[in-house]
C-alpha cells in the first residue's frame, strides 16, 4: 500500500528534477519508479483529486482507496458563543503564499463590519518577502486585518477561535483539506474559498460547505487582457521549463 502525499509533479519542480536525476536517471523512467503498477500494489491518496490523478495515469480504480487524515480539535469549545462586540473572521493558517493573503485583504476592504485575523507568519525565509508585502499593503490601506495573532503567549488558539464569529479560508491549494473540517469541530461556521477538487469527497460524506465560493469574478474592463494573457503564457512556459518540458507549438 503506497500512501502518496505531495506529488512532485504538483508544483514541486525542484523535487521532481532531484528525484528524476537521482532515482531514475530521467523523467521518463521516474513514473515507473514512483508509481508501480502490479496486482499487489494499491494506492491510498488523501483526497478525490489525487485519486483521480492516479486513475487517469493508469492505476485501476479498485486499487486506489481514498484514505482521509484524522482531524484533531483546535482547542476551542464547540458550544462557546463568540466573545466581544466585534465580528471577527479568523484565518487559522501559516501564511505561506498559497494561502492567498491578498484575498483576505480584498474582503477586509469590502466588509466594513468585520475585523480579520491571520494566526501565524510563515517560517520559511523564502516565503517572508511576499508575506511582508501583504502586511505592508494592509497597513498602508488601513485595513482591519491583524497578523500573527496566534503568536501571542496570552491568547492560545482556542481562545482566538472562541472570540471569532467564523473561520475563513482563501487558500488556492490544499492537500487533504483540514481547513474545511476543523472549524466544525470548533463550533464555528466556515466562509471563504472552496477548492472543489479537494472538498468533493468531504461533500460526498455530508459536510455542508454551501457558504463557500469557487471563484471571484473580476470584470475584464479592470485590467489589460493582452498583458494578462502574456503573463499567463510566460508563467506556463516557466513551469514547463522548470520540469524540463517543451512548450507546445499552439501557445499564443
Task: Please annotate each region the language model reported.
Residues 8, 18-43:
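Membrane-proximal helix-turn-helix segments that form the acceptor-binding/catalytic region
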Residues 49, 70:
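Carbohydrate-associated surface elements
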Residues 131-159, 205-224:
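Nucleotide-activated donor-binding/catalytic signature segment of Leloir-type glycosyltransferases, i.e.
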Residues 172:
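Aromatic "clamp/platform" in nucleotide-sugar-dependent glycosyltransferases that forms part
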Residues 44, 80-99, 105-108, 117:
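Conserved donor-binding/catalytic core segment of Leloir-type glycosyltransferases
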Amino acid at each position: 500500500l503506497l500512501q502518496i502525499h505531495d506529488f512532485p509533479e504538483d508544483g514541486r519542480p525542484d523535487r521532481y528534477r532531484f528525484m528524476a536525476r537521482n532515482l531514475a536517471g530521467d523523467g521518463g523512467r521516474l513514473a515507473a519508479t514512483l508509481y508501480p503498477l502490479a496486482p499487489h500494489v494499491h494506492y491510498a491518496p488523501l483526497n478525490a483529486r489525487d485519486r483521480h490523478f492516479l486513475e487517469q495515469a493508469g492505476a485501476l480504480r479498485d486499487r486506489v482507496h481514498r484514505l482521509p487524515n484524522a482531524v484533531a480539535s483546535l482547542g476551542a469549545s464547540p458550544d462557546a458563543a463568540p466573545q466581544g462586540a466585534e465580528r471577527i473572521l479568523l484565518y487559522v493558517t501559516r501564511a505561506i503564499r498559497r494561502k492567498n493573503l491578498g484575498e483576505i485583504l480584498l474582503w477586509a476592504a469590502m466588509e466594513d463590519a468585520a475585523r480579520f485575523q491571520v494566526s501565524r507568519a510563515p517560517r520559511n525565509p523564502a516565503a517572508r518577502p511576499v508575506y511582508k508585502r501583504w502586511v505592508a499593503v494592509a497597513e498602508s490601506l488601513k485595513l482591519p486585518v491583524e497578523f500573527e495573532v496566534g503568536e501571542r503567549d496570552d491568547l492560545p488558539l482556542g481562545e482566538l477561535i472562541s472570540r471569532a464569529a467564523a473561520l475563513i479560508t482563501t487558500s488556492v491549494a490544499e492537500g487533504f483539506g483540514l481547513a474545511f473540517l476543523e472549524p466544525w469541530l470548533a463550533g464555528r461556521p466556515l466562509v471563504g474559498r472552496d477548492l472543489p477538487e479537494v472538498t468533493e469527497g468531504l461533500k460526498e460524506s455530508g459536510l455542508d460547505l454551501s457558504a463557500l465560493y469557487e471563484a471571484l469574478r473580476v470584470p475584464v474592463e479592470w485590467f489589460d487582457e493582452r498583458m494578462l494573457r502574456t503573463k499567463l503564457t510566460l508563467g506556463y512556459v516557466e513551469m514547463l521549463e522548470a520540469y524540463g518540458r517543451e512548450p507546445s507549438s499552439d501557445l499564443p
